[in-house]
C-alpha cells in the first residue's frame, strides 16, 4: 500500500465545500430531450429514468465531481465536511414522461415486477408519506410544467436521498448554462445540518425516484452480494455511511446459501468465507466509489469529437445512435456469455486433492441454474423455495434461457431492461442448424401479433421484447448449475497503461532495481522504445501507425521494393536492439520467459462509458473482484479461528473487526487491485457558506462557519491489472500440444505466409488480366512453380516477385512463432521484428500466446430481420411486413479481429474481457498472499462469431487447439469519439523530416558507399534548392554523419554543372551514367593481416585501462555469439 499523500496534492483536499447534491431544472422548450433519451433508460410509461452525469447536457461545464459535502452540524457553530465524489448517473424524476423511451416495447414494468417475485427479491416499499410536491422544491418564478427535474447526488449520500432525508433549499437557487439551455439548480443538504430539525414536509422525497434507485442501483448490488432483501441492504449501507461502521459486520444475517453450499462436506467454513467476503466488499467498495476521482476528458459532452460534423439535432441523435451501436458488443457479451459477471452465483470450494493451490481452493462460480434454486439462511432454515423455470421444452425444468433470465440480468429494473433491449437490437441473430424456425416476418405477423402475448397483447409486435428474444434466442447461454472454477467476464474502461504488443512487458525495466549507477552514455533501450523507433522508421517510408500507405504499389517491382524497404528498417532496428542488450549484459533469454501482456481496468467511475448499463457493470465487476481477492484471506483467518458450529453472523461478531482492519494491507497492491491512501484536510479552519437556517426561511445571508473533516483517510482505487503470459512454459500435455510448433513443412506455406493478404489486396494491380483468384494462384504456384505474366509486362519482374514471395514465405515458415497472417504493414513489421528477437532468445519451439482485439464495426443492412425499425405500428400479415421493411435499413454491429491489440489500446478503449484471479505466496520464505489477474476465455457459443472454432486459414484444415494460444478482448476505441485526439504540441518542420530520412539511409547502408542514395534523396526532397546548399547546411542535414558533407556537395555541384532537371529520376539517371551506379567504382584493395598482439601498438598511443578493455571484449564476444544466429 502506498503511503498517504500530503494534503496539498490529493484531489480530496483540493475539492471545495458544497452541498450533498443538486436538483437541476431544465427548460423543456430548449432542452435536447431526444439526446437525453438516447443516453438514458426510458421505457414505455416510465416515471423516472437515469442519465449519465455529463458536463454540457446534464450539468454545467466546469462542474466539479469532487466535493467536501457539508452534511452535519453537531452544534450551530461547527460544521462537518466529508470528501466525496458524485454518483455517475443522475435521476430524472419530474416530468420524466416528456423524455422519449429508448425502447418502445410495452409491458416491461409488469414483467420486472413478476420476475422479481419469482426470483425471491423484495420489491420497493414506499415510505409512509407522500412524495414532495413541486412547490416544496421548485424556486419561485418557475412553472413546474415547463421544466424537467433531475437530481445529481454524491456517492456518500445517495442512501439519504433514497430514504428522504435530504432537504432542498429553493431560496439558494443558482442559474447555470447546461448546453444551450438556461437551467436552474437548487442545493440539497442533509437534514442533520439543521440542529433545530426540519419538518418532514420540507424533506425532499420522491417515491418514483427511490423506486428507480431500488431497482436500477441497489438490486444489482444485492445480486453481487447474493442477498435478496434489498431494502434492508440499503438501510445497512446508510447506517454504515452515517455512523462510520465499516468495521462492523452487517450483511451476514441477510445472506442466503444454495443447496450446493449447505450440502458441502465443509459447509461451515464455506458459509463463513462467503459471508466474510461479502462483508469486506460492503466495507471497502463504497469507500472506493465515494473517493475523489480524476475528471476524465470524456466527461465534457459538449466537446465530444463525435459531434464535430453534425449539423442540427437530428445529426447529433444519429451520431449518438452509432456510438451506442459500437458499445453494443460489450453489453451483448454480458448477456450471451455463460460466465458473465451478471451470472456469478456464489462461492465454491474444491474437494479434490488435485494440484490446485490451497489458496485457490475457494473460488467464485457462476450459473443461472444456481440463481433460481432454493436457498437457506445462515441458520440453515429454508428461506426461498426456488423457481423451476418456464415450461419452454415441455420438461418443466431449467436448461433453456428465458425472458425472465434476461430480466434477472437487468436487475429486475424496467429502466435497465429497456436499455439492454436497445443494445440487443443492434445484434445479429445466429440461427441454429439443428432447430429450423419460421422467418421473422411470419413470427411478427403471427405469434407476436396474437392477443396472447403477455407483454404487448398483439398491439406492438415489432418492438415487443418477446419478438426481440425470439430473433436472438439461439445466442442466449444455457441455464446450468456449475461448480467449476471458470473466469468471469468484466466490462469497463481500459486504464492508460497497457502493454499489449507481441512481447508485452518484455524489457520494460519497471519494478527492477538498479544495483549501481549507469553511465550516461548507456541509456536503457526498452522494448517499448524499440516499437516506437520502428513506427518512426515506417513513417519515413510513408506508412502510418495503422499500416496505411501514402503511395500504393503499381506493379511487382513496387510491391517487392515496399517489402524490402520494410525488411531493411526492421533488420536495422533489430541489430541495434540486440547490440544494446548484449552491451548492457541483459539476460534477455531468461527475461523473455517471464514477460506478460498487461491490461489495465480503470477503477474511476467517470472513466466508464456514459451509459447506466456500464455503471451497473462497473459496480458488479468491482464488488465481484473484491470478494474474489478476499477469499484466501478469509480462508486463512477461518483456518486459524475455526467456527466450530457457529453460524456466520456469530463468527463474524468476534472476528470481523480484525479481518477488516488487516484486509487493506493484505489485499491491496498485491498484484491485482492498486489503490492509494490519501489524507484529506481542509486548509482553512473556517469557510464561507450561506446561512442555511435563514435560507430555509427564504432569507439569504452569508456566514463564516468553523468546519472540520468528519473522515480524514480516503482509499482511492486506481486500476485492476490483468495479465497474459506470452511464452508457454507449462508442463500440461494438452496445452503443450496447442502451443507446440510442427517441424513438418506445410504445402501451403505461401497462403499462410506473411504476404498473402497483401497479395490479395493488390491482386488486380499485380495481375490485371487474370481471372484466377489470388488464393488459387499462389496455392498453385507453391505446387507447380508457375505464375501468369500479363501481356506487355516484364517476365523478369514477375519472376523476381515470385522468387521473393517464395523465399520470404519459406524463411517465415521456419522462424515464425507468432500465429497471425499480417493484414497491414505495421503488423508485418512487428511480426518480423519479434520473430527475430524470439529466435535470438532461443524461443523457436512453441508459438507465443496472443491477445486479439474484437473491434466493433457498425453497418447498415436491409431491415427484413430487424422488425424494431417499424416501431409500434401494427402488422397484419407476413406480406405486409415484407413490404413495410423492404425500403428500410437497420443499424447493426459486427466485430472484426485485430492481429495486434497495441494500436487499439492507445485509443483508450472500452474493454470486455474474462479474468481469473489466481492466488499464491511469495518466494524465499515470504508467506504473504499475492494475486494475479489472468486473462481467461469466454464461454457460450452465442457470444461472437469470431469466437467460434474456425477450420483455419487457406486450404488446410487446422488441428484443434489454435484458440488456446489466442485470447480475445472486446475493445471499442473512444479516441476521436468521446475524447479528442491529441494534437502535436509543436509542428514538425520539413527540414527535420529530410534530416531524419538521410540519417536513416546512411544507418542502413553503412557497408556500402551511400553518397549516391543520399544525393538522390536530397534532390527528391529539396529540388533546385540543392544548388544553393552551403557546407553548414549540408553538415546540419547529415547530422552525426556530417563527414560526408564534402562528398555530397561535390556530387551536387556535378549535377548543377550538367544543367539537368532537378528531379530524383533525372539525377539518378545522370549519376548512373557518370558513375555506373552506386558503388560501381573499381578500386584495387590489398589484404591487411590482423596484428598478432597489441603491446607494440599500445606504446605508440593511449594505454586503455584493463577493466574497460576486458569488459568491452566480453561484450563484443557476447554480441558475436548472438548476431550470427540472428536471421533478419
UniProtKB/Swiss-Prot annotation:
Cellular component per GO, a single term: viral tegument
GO biological process terms on file: DNA replication
Domain of life: Viruses
InterPro entries: DBP_sf, Viral_ssDBP_head, Viral_ssDNA-bd
Region (Required for nuclear localization): 1104-1128
Keywords: DNA replication, DNA-binding, Host nucleus, Virion, Virion tegument
SUPFAM superfamilies in alphabetical order: Viral ssDNA binding protein
Function per UniProt: Plays several crucial roles in viral infection. Participates in the opening of the viral DNA origin to initiate replication by interacting with the origin-binding protein. May disrupt loops, hairpins and other secondary structures present on ssDNA to reduce and eliminate pausing of viral DNA polymerase at specific sites during elongation. Promotes viral DNA recombination by performing strand-transfer, characterized by the ability to transfer a DNA strand from a linear duplex to a complementary single-stranded DNA circle. Can also catalyze the renaturation of complementary single strands.
Protein name (record): Major DNA-binding protein
Organism: Epstein-Barr virus (strain GD1)
Lineage: Viruses, Duplodnaviria, Heunggongvirae, Peploviricota, Herviviricetes
